[in-house]
Amino acid sequence: LEAEPDIWQVFISRGAGIPDQDAFERRLYVIRKRFEKAIQRWGIRDADWFYFPSLSSRTLVYKGMLTATQLRTYFPDLSDRHLISALAMFHSRFSTNTFPSWELAHPYRMIAHNGEINTL
């Protein structure tokens, strides 16, 4: 666990001035992009370690260097009976030419793949 990064989970509610969920999603996207750029501008020593797997009102994306059997223990909210989801997707990265590390763990916002997309 020495290599494990700090993980923070935030929840942002839609304000009264945002008319619908689509507008809220657009606002969250802009907030995430601005914050990512600001982190680089601020010259934070470990800026490369800042990563937002998701900032969405529709999806939760978790990042971890885990096996499938470790998910429920590491992210206990996935076992909470109050958390309702239509879908859960897990991708396990098995390094073939690099040493496993947290920064290489796959956090997919939209798609999971093996890193070799070569056809459309």
Predicted stretch roles:
Residues L1-L120:
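N-terminal segments that mediate ammonia production and transfer
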